[in-house]
Amino acid sequence: MDHKIDLLQPALEAALAGKIQALVRDRGELTLTVTAADYLAVCTTLRDHAELKLEQLIDLCGLDYSSYKDGAGSPYTEGPRYCVVLHLLSVSKNWRLRLKVFCADDGLPVVPSVNEIWAAANWFEREAFDLYGIVFEGHADLRRILTDYGFIGHPFRKDFPTTGHVEMRYDAEQRRVIYQPVTIEPREITPRIIREDNYGGLH
């Protein structure tokens, strides 16, 4: 696959001159990072350019980099918190690309929707909105897809409580499911490692 990357990398550099924030080659894969302002134009070029032809969106997801701020030596200790990651495939040229775009505002993370470029983005963008609160501007039907309509918050954010905000139970008197405050007390869980001789057949 390295010979494919040898062809894809210069093609990206030529087609996206001035719009590449970072282009990293690692473990036989290319990761392209662009700004939110260039995101739509770059996606259109990636799909339509004769030398790139990344016609298929395989996956799109959100990321919350807030916990990286505590990690030493990470490239994500500074900068935006939320990121959208796309995995693209060229069926005609048989190569793949990872595309990353960071949301400019941590308070209200917004990036343009690519649903008009790749129709497969529709439910992926709804999922990232539901789980991370990332708003995809221009999406025709941006509503929750995994949690219920009354859900409070976005459960994949690093600051979302593991117990949640409310719990549901069936009330026999009302004969329906009701919401109530969480009855589990928050606690700190410390993992314990128990080492035993000959554990797992190891000596």
From Swiss-Prot:
EC number(s) recorded for this UniProt protein: 7.1.1.-
SUPFAM superfamilies: Nqo5-like
Xref: InterPro entries: NADH_DH_suC (IPR010218), NADH_quin_OxRdtase_su_C/D-like (IPR037232), NADH_UbQ_OxRdtase_30kDa_su (IPR001268), NADH_UbQ_OxRdtase_CS (IPR020396)
Catalytic activity line of the entry: a quinone + NADH + 5 H(+)(in) = a quinol + NAD(+) + 4 H(+)(out)
Keyword DNA-binding part of the UniProt annotation: no
Similarity-based family: Belongs to the complex I 30 kDa subunit family.
Record membrane topology: Peripheral membrane protein
Protein task: NDH-1 shuttles electrons from NADH, via FMN and iron-sulfur (Fe-S) centers, to quinones in the respiratory chain. The immediate electron acceptor for the enzyme in this species is believed to be ubiquinone. Couples the redox reaction to proton translocation (for every two electrons transferred, four hydrogen ions are translocated across the cytoplasmic membrane), and thus conserves the redox energy in a proton gradient.
Keywords of the record: Cell inner membrane, Cell membrane, Membrane, NAD, Quinone, Translocase, Transport, Ubiquinone
Subunit note: NDH-1 is composed of 14 different subunits. Subunits NuoB, C, D, E, F, and G constitute the peripheral sector of the complex.
HAMAP family assigned to the protein according to its UniProt record, in alphabetical order: NDH1_NuoC
Top-level taxonomic group: Bacteria
EC category: translocase
GO cellular component: plasma membrane
A Pfam short name: Complex1_30kDa
GO MF annotations, alphabetized: NADH dehydrogenase (ubiquinone) activity; NADH:ubiquinone reductase (non-electrogenic) activity; quinone binding
Protein name: NADH-quinone oxidoreductase subunit C
Subcellular location: Cell inner membrane
